[in-house]
């Protein structure tokens, strides 16, 4: 018979050093349970357990007379309550929890408080995951892992006060800037290696290491999170593997697929995938569905794009090895010493990584052909430049000042001839048409332009082929700038709309050279290359439309 919520919680000695997944954007928790896992949260305590009020108790019986008379114990600090905090925005939501930013009223300190519904934990059979994360987090004390500061409860919920990783997921920055330069890749890889060395030294396998589970604190150092699927290897047991299927498809190790087991070396495989993604912008194993991804993993089917850093490539090749006992860093390969001595880390000082200043995040955009040039972009500089994009009478002179400001003029007055002369694959319209002329243009576009089907009946103002880059990979796309405004991009071979660059007041074009131009948005920078060498024309036209939208229409700027 199922226990009531109060009975469940009475059986759970919640410790002040215990935490569930603290990721601001928790990944989906799996439904599999470990063989031998208790169906409920055990009522016993760990090696240094806690009573319900958070006091520490020894697991062994005590003959101390003071402990036999609870009334003689010194008073304990008052447990925190929900009313001690001002709760703010939601940082993330998981399958059975919500993480909320909260400020403690007495100290003004900020925490990421994870809130769990007791009843839902029982109903959805999530007790094993609560137990697992409790056991793992109670063993960790390292700057590269999330920290639990306190726990408390009310009648319906459990609350866990966690360190607030202010800068969010590492994945967010990979998506924003595409690929990291070598200095950034080296530093963050070193921090992950240092964290794994500590974790594996504690006999713990993470089993779901990926950029989503690596957070960045206020100082841009990593904090690894999400231990719901971790495994603690018993020191009394010779078993060095965990026998259950957990993880995320792109980072799953081959032994998990073929033997249904994971080991410490499985985390090293995930490390190899992460290094590859930091440099290339995408994980090494990609396909249309999980089955195809798994097939590529067990066949070791991946390739390095051109301009991949040679030393980083060598390191990845020594980590993405099908035989788990042959991966650099595993116990069979003499542990972490040889891994940390790899030439990729030759400039790293390992002793005090958490006290070092992380390098500024810088995008790496190597030239795609011999007549191009490498481009680098500083993420911090980009964010500071967004401040100059505000539309007001006092700041309009700063808006998009990096590109030309004059509007192109249409030559001649014969609109029919103008329409007739338009190329069906690449052209640019000016913005000086009357409403009747725009109507004629739209009619012509609807009747004869093969790209009209993708633009939601908006008039195309400029279009042409570009190479759209994501990390070190580039794909040919048809870029369509329309009224609205919109920036659509289409697969020209399969004739499929692939996406849209989001317009906002903060959007900013930037020409890097004749071919390469960026479109900066708050959440991502789009890297584009015009094969005709007219990047400046794209920037000029995007600027025109931006100005018409936000300077000619002040109401749009405040929406």
Swiss-Prot record:
Q: Where is this region: Disordered?
A: 25-83
Changes seen on gene knockout: Mice show severe pancreatic hypoplasia at birth and ensuing hyperglycemia at postnatal stages and die of heart failure by 11 weeks of age.
| Compositionally biased region (Low complexity) | 35-44
Q: What is known of its domains?
A: The PH domain plays a pivotal role in the localization and nuclear import of PDPK1 and is also essential for its homodimerization. The PIF-pocket is a small lobe in the catalytic domain required by the enzyme for the binding to the hydrophobic motif of its substrates. It is an allosteric regulatory site that can accommodate small compounds acting as allosteric inhibitors.
Family membership, please give it. Answer: Belongs to the protein kinase superfamily. AGC Ser/Thr protein kinase family. PDPK1 subfamily.
Instruction: Indicate the quaternary assembly.
Output: Homodimer in its autoinhibited state. Active as monomer. Interacts with NPRL2, PAK1, PTK2B, GRB14, STRAP and IKKB. The Tyr-9 phosphorylated form interacts with SRC, RASA1 and CRK (via their SH2 domains). Interacts with SGK3 in a phosphorylation-dependent manner. The tyrosine-phosphorylated form interacts with PTPN6. The Ser-244 phosphorylated form interacts with YWHAH and YWHAQ. Binds INSR in response to insulin. Interacts (via PH domain) with SMAD3, SMAD4 and SMAD7.
Tell me what this protein is called. 3-phosphoinositide-dependent protein kinase 1
Organism source for this protein? Mus musculus (Mouse)
The gene from which this protein is expressed is Pdpk1
């Amino acid at each position: 018979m199922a226990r009531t919520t109060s009975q469940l919680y009475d059986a759970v000695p919640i410790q002040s050093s215990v935490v569930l997944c603290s990721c601001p954007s928790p990944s989906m928790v799996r439904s599999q349970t470990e063989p031998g896992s208790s169906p409920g949260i055990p009522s016993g305590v760990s090696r240094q357990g806690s009573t319900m009020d958070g006091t520490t108790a020894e697991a062994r019986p005590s003959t101390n007379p003071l402990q036999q008379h609870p009334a003689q114990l010194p008073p304990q600090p008052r447990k925190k309550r929900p009313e001690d905090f001002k709760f703010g925005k939601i940082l993330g939501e998981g399958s059975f929890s919500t993480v909320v930013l909260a400020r403690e009223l007495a100290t003004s300190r900020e925490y990421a408080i994870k809130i769990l519904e007791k009843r839902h934990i029982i109903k959805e059979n999530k007790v094993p995951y609560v137990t697992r994360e409790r056991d793992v987090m109670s063993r960790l004390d390292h700057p590269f892992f999330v920290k639990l500061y306190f726990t408390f409860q009310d009648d319906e919920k459990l609350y866990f006060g966690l360190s607030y990783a202010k800068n969010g997921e590492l994945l967010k920055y990979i998506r924003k800037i595409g690929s990291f330069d070598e200095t950034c890749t080296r530093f963050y890889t070193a921090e992950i290696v240092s964290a794994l060395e500590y974790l594996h030294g504690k006999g713990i396998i993470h089993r779901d290491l990926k950029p989503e589970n690596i957070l960045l604190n206020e100082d841009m150092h990593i904090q690894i999170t999400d231990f719901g699927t971790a495994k603690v290897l018993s020191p009394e047991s010779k078993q060095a593997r965990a026998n259950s299927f957990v993880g995320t498809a792109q980072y799953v190790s081959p032994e998990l697929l073929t033997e249904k087991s994971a080991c410490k070396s499985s985390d090293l495989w995930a490390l190899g995938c992460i290094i590859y993604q930091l440099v290339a912008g995408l994980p090494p194993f990609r396909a249309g569905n999980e089955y195809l991804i798994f097939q590529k993993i067990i066949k070791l089917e991946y390739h390095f794009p051109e301009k991949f850093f040679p030393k980083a490539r060598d390191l990845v090749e020594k980590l993405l090895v099908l035989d788990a006992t042959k991966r650099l860093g595993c116990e069979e390969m003499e542990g972490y010493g040889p891994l940390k001595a790899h030439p990729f880390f030759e400039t790293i000082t390992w002793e005090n990584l958490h006290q070092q200043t992380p390098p500024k995040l810088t995008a790496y955009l190597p030239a795609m052909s011999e007549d191009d040039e490498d481009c680098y972009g500083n993420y911090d500089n980009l964010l500071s430049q967004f401040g100059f994009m505000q539309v007001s009478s006092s700041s309009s002179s700063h808006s998009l000042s990096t590109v030309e400001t004059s509007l192109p003029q249409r030559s001649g007055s014969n609109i029919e001839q103008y329409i007739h002369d338009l190329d069906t694959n690449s052209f640019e319209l000016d913005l000086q048409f009357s409403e009747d002329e725009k109507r004629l243009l739209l009619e012509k576009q609807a009747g004869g332009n093969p790209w009209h089907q993708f633009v939601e009946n908006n008039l195309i103002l400029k279009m042409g082929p570009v190479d759209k880059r994501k990390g070190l990979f580039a794909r040919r796309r048809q870029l369509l700038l329309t009224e609205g405004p919109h920036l659509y991009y289409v697969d020209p071979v399969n004739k499929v709309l692939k996406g849209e660059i989001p317009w906002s007041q903060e959007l900013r074009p930037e020409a890097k050279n004749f071919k390469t131009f960026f479109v900066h948005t708050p959440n991502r920078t789009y890297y584009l290359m015009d094969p005709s060498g007219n990047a400046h024309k794209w920037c000029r036209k995007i600027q025109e439309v931006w100005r018409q939208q936000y300077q000619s229409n002040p109401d749009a700027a405040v929406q």
